[in-house]
Amino acid sequence: MKIICAHQKHEDGTPHADWLQARTGRITASRIGDVMSYLKPTKAMIEARVKPEESQKRKDYRMEILCERLTAVPAEHFVSKPMKFGSEYEDDARREYELKMETMVDQTGFVLHTAFDYAGCSPDGLVGTEGAVQIKVPNTETHLGYLLGDVVPEEYKPQMYFEMDCCELAWSDFVSYDPRLPDPLKLFVKRLHYDDERVQLIAGEVLCFNDSVNAWIDMLRKRFGDFKLPAQIAAKVQSQDYDGLGISDEEIRAVDPAWQG
């Protein structure tokens, strides 16, 4: 596991400067859902095995990463009232999890992917040498939906799989916490186990996404003249091919039809 900064936040909850710098220009686990986001394919596209169009979320995230790599300035994100509430109670959720599971959760900073330095994750906590936690403090309606559904929500699985890949873990617990509910309903925990097929598919998508960002940088150079990336960014984003990642040609072509092997 390659941890490059020890803390995500200061005691007052504000982001740690080292953590922000570590993330800037890198593809992060919290945005893997955007990396994997495509428009729903038509029947004709499925029959012809044509890759679906990118969603606007994927396009927007590519532009965000491009801006960060050209400027070394982290993107600004709006923090809503519910998000502030969640941040305030995340430590409580972590403690409740520790009590229920009779274990300890270690906090960490930014962890690089095992195979490439231009991507990584910031786990909400590590559990021993094999596990992690993904903590959410949602509104009550959403939390009750998790309790009644009794499954790991699909929208968080890509992030959790990628965190397991980065940290070389066997499992990750999805944790939802709502301090407003009666005690038996406050905490929901559901475990997601490592799935090699899903993990390698996501790794392939991350490679393709990074290549597309680099393609835009190359296009700007060709149109407007050569330039260098900021020094603190250049070391993070060296191009990487698919070799050594344990991904088969078939898996790569599923996300990158142009791949020739």
Where are these regions (language model features)?
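Accessory terminal regions of nucleic-acid processing enzymes
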Residues: 1-261
